[in-house]
């Protein structure tokens, strides 16, 4: 993806050999940390920090540069470099706002790395949720055993993102909650 200054997004497919794409998919592991976070608070702090700190702005630019670098590696078949770049990116992302990581997340991350992960990151704004790791297949059992977190099966979708209809409108849930609190 390329995010343009006018708010538009340019999507360009990542062209990879099918066997390399399959290897990448096999080596990605996702775990649910069980922790919740406020994405809006983290993103608000991050936005302020980027305005007020040249270092944080440089770190974000480096993250963008790493993504472009990774694209070239993946298209060239160097799939295992994904782990290294995920790691470097995560180290940079942690500097952008105080709530992006916490001691519990740091402990999970360090444990996975010691058990054989080549790199990883917390998905989303930070603070909790899902950890994604790039782990060679022969080390996945050790990572799984060390983390003891619910593992979420991961499979690439070649169709792109899609909206899933749940059947409950957010405002309906809010109104039900308000009725319960009033009673």
Please provide the spans of the model-predicted regions.
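Glycine-rich active-site/cofactor-binding loop and its immediate structural neighborhood
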Residues: 128
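C-terminal nucleotide
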Residues: 1-120, 132-183
